[in-house]
């Protein structure tokens, strides 16, 4: 077969391990071997993990709402259908400090599933320099606490 289809109604959404952000791993559900792609739906006040990748680029595309993305010390504000490419080594975090939901498509190379609950302390420090639950200053800083 030369293609696969995942209907929106069939996509499996789940909250992320650390920050509770709803996401669906499109690439995994479509059995992609050379591509990583997820949709992330951030409610007002939510943020993804502040993290880095040592070898892979990531493309961030805002599909709905206003996209807010911190890359190292810069904060980007992106309109729907705008995109940002983040290079390897840069620390990045999407967050939502607006009053409406934001939907992101994040595309990159396939990465092994990163289970932050089972990582060594050294790996956690390398990938998540502020810890896997760090909130951006725009959301008050500190750590995310599950409800």
Name these PLM-found stretches.
Residues 73-89:
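Short acidic-glycine-tyrosine-enriched beta hairpin
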Residues 23-25, 38-53:
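Conserved short histidine dyad/triad with adjacent acidic residue
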Residues 31, 68, 88-115:
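Ligand-binding loop in jelly-roll beta-barrel domains
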Residues 1-34, 119-147:
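A short, N-terminal "cap"/entry segment at the start of jelly-roll beta-barrel domains
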Residues 55-57, 61-67:
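Glycine- and acidic-residue-biased ligand/ion/polar-headgroup-sensing regions
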Residues 38-40, 60, 95, 105:
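Conserved hydrophobic/aromatic positions in well-ordered beta-strands
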């Amino acid at each position: 077969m030369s293609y696969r289809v995942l209907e929106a109604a069939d996509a499996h959404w789940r909250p992320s391990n650390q920050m509770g952000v709803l996401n669906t791993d499109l690439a995994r559900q479509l059995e992609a071997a050379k591509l990583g792609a997820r949709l992330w739906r951030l409610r007002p006040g939510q943020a993804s993990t502040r993290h880095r990748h040592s070898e892979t680029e990531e493309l961030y595309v805002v599909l709905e709402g206003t996209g807010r993305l911190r890359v190292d010390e810069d904060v980007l504000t992106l309109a729907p259908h705008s995109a940002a490419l983040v290079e390897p080594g840069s620390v990045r975090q999407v967050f939502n400090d607006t009053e409406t939901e934001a939907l992101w498509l994040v595309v990159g190379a396939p990465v092994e599933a990163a289970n932050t609950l089972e990582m060594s302390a050294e790996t956690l420090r390398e990938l998540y320099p502020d810890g896997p639950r760090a909130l951006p200053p725009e959301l008050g800083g500190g750590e995310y606490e599950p409800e």
